Amino acid sequence: MANAVGRRSWAALRLCAAVILLDLAVCKGFVEDLNESFKDNRKDDIWLVDFYAPWCGHCKKLEPIWNEVGLEMKSIGSPVKVGKMDATSYSSIASEFGVRGYPTIKLLKGDLAYNYRGPRTKDDIIEFAHRVSGALIRPLPSQQMFDHVRKRHRVFFVYIGGESPLKEKYIDAASELIVYTYFFSASEDVVPEYVTLKEMPAVLVFKDDTYFVYDEYEDGDLSSWISRERFQNYLTMDGFLLYELGDTGKLVAIAVIDEKNTSLEHTRLKSIIQEVARDFRDHFHRDFQFGHMDGNDYINTLLMDELTVPTIVVLNTSNQQYFLLDRHIKDASDMVQFINSILDGTVPAQGGDSIFQRLKRIVFDAKSTIVSIFKSSPLMGCFLFGLPLGVISIMCYGIYTADTDGGYIEERYEVSKSEMENQEQIEESKEQESSSGGSLAPTVQEPKDVLEKKKD
């Protein structure tokens, strides 16, 4: 009986493994491996391509998601083909498309190449492909179509009117920013009745259950205005969003909380930020972005400081400055006063991108890297840092002892040289004495003895 149960369990496991392998094979079957022929054969189709490197860890994480993207695009009958290319093997093609890092996702449409900079999730990548592969400016022929778009998209832009210089600017902005948001065009009778326009033509953004009209005098360049307005007024923040918000020029007011903590203080600060974003939209939406962030890990890295949770911080992502609370925030009116104090300059900014802050950033990043390595793998940390330190220590010891031995040899050389000079001087003096003694011998007469005297 036990053997029979074991055999059935083993058969079930093998069946599950076979199903998983079959799913993987099916998913991979809808993602084409591209080679050098892709350069010449691609222009008749629209391609969504993942440029990867075999050794890249982020590329390996993206691979199963990319296979799901290929399967989904095929199942819905999308005209976009999904492929992947080893950018290290076909580096010339990757360079031609402007690949600078791995993985790089691009949608190739004719002679145009669009970079994907969003979250690496299946739904976000597929939405990007649909948005960019379609028409640059999509027409809204009826109010029913307008209502459908309104329900489907959280943020979208609409040009209302006929041919004009403003429409040309709108088309230019759309060609640059289509990777981020949707662009539509409509006639005045298609727009809902609650939309009031002072003049025509006009460009509007619909978001947060309301709309805003572009004013060239107050808002400046159209592309810059679209870049600022392409986000909802209140967002759940993460590192990617903060990076994207750096292009808007807006200050970002964030409630840093622990979403798992349901205490009053955490929910209160989040509610205050939401209330200010909603009720003071007309006052601050040009200059401020609002949201909350779960946890303080990313903020601590950005500020190079340890923030207590919960708290509120205002970031200037364009120059890395930040503002911390100078008062206790009781309600939305206190938060409004704090924001106004930032705008009028009475609250001092901290951080920045000065030379000192850059040096501080280098030291902080190095310290954080070392700490993270030792936390994740102490043995690896000891090997990575202990081995180089040991080699450097041995080299320093060798250099020091070499200098000492060299000094000793040099000193002995000097002593030997002086001894030789002394010896030469002694020998020279002896030679002089012997030579002087030989020259005096013939002139000195020895005393005669008695017999010699008698002979004389």
From Swiss-Prot:
<feature type="active site" description="Nucleophile">
    <location>
        <position position="56"/>
    </location>
</feature>
<feature type="glycosylation site" description="N-linked (GlcNAc...) asparagine">
    <location>
        <position position="35"/>
    </location>
</feature>
<feature type="region of interest" description="Disordered">
    <location>
        <begin position="416"/>
        <end position="456"/>
    </location>
</feature>
<dbReference type="GO" id="GO:0005789">
    <property type="term" value="C:endoplasmic reticulum membrane"/>
</dbReference>
<feature type="glycosylation site" description="N-linked (GlcNAc...) asparagine">
    <location>
        <position position="261"/>
    </location>
</feature>
<feature type="signal peptide">
    <location>
        <begin position="1"/>
        <end position="29"/>
    </location>
</feature>
<keyword id="KW-1015">Disulfide bond</keyword>
<feature type="active site" description="Nucleophile">
    <location>
        <position position="59"/>
    </location>
</feature>
<keyword id="KW-0325">Glycoprotein</keyword>
<keyword id="KW-0676">Redox-active center</keyword>
<feature type="topological domain" description="Lumenal">
    <location>
        <begin position="30"/>
        <end position="378"/>
    </location>
</feature>
<dbReference type="InterPro" id="IPR036249">
    <property type="entry name" value="Thioredoxin-like_sf"/>
</dbReference>
<dbReference type="GO" id="GO:0015035">
    <property type="term" value="F:protein-disulfide reductase activity"/>
</dbReference>
<dbReference type="InterPro" id="IPR013766">
    <property type="entry name" value="Thioredoxin_domain"/>
</dbReference>
<feature type="glycosylation site" description="N-linked (GlcNAc...) asparagine">
    <location>
        <position position="316"/>
    </location>
</feature>
<dbReference type="GO" id="GO:0009986">
    <property type="term" value="C:cell surface"/>
</dbReference>
<keyword id="KW-0732">Signal</keyword>
<dbReference type="InterPro" id="IPR017937">
    <property type="entry name" value="Thioredoxin_CS"/>
</dbReference>
<dbReference type="Pfam" id="PF00085">
    <property type="entry name" value="Thioredoxin"/>
</dbReference>
<feature type="disulfide bond" description="Redox-active">
    <location>
        <begin position="56"/>
        <end position="59"/>
    </location>
</feature>
<dbReference type="GO" id="GO:0003756">
    <property type="term" value="F:protein disulfide isomerase activity"/>
</dbReference>
<feature type="short sequence motif" description="Di-lysine motif">
    <location>
        <begin position="453"/>
        <end position="456"/>
    </location>
</feature>
<comment type="similarity">
    <text>Belongs to the protein disulfide isomerase family.</text>
</comment>
<keyword id="KW-0256">Endoplasmic reticulum</keyword>
<feature type="compositionally biased region" description="Basic and acidic residues">
    <location>
        <begin position="446"/>
        <end position="456"/>
    </location>
</feature>
<feature type="topological domain" description="Cytoplasmic">
    <location>
        <begin position="400"/>
        <end position="456"/>
    </location>
</feature>
<keyword id="KW-0472">Membrane</keyword>
<comment type="function">
    <text>Probable disulfide isomerase, which participates in the folding of proteins containing disulfide bonds. May act as a dithiol oxidase. Acts as a regulator of endoplasmic reticulum-mitochondria contact sites via its ability to regulate redox signals.</text>
</comment>
<dbReference type="Pfam" id="PF13848">
    <property type="entry name" value="Thioredoxin_6"/>
</dbReference>
<keyword id="KW-0812">Transmembrane</keyword>
<feature type="transmembrane region" description="Helical">
    <location>
        <begin position="379"/>
        <end position="399"/>
    </location>
</feature>
<protein>
    <recommendedName>
        <fullName>Protein disulfide-isomerase TMX3</fullName>
        <ecNumber>5.3.4.1</ecNumber>
    </recommendedName>
</protein>
<dbReference type="InterPro" id="IPR052250">
    <property type="entry name" value="PDI_TMX3"/>
</dbReference>
<feature type="domain" description="Thioredoxin">
    <location>
        <begin position="30"/>
        <end position="131"/>
    </location>
</feature>
<keyword id="KW-0413">Isomerase</keyword>
<keyword id="KW-1133">Transmembrane helix</keyword>
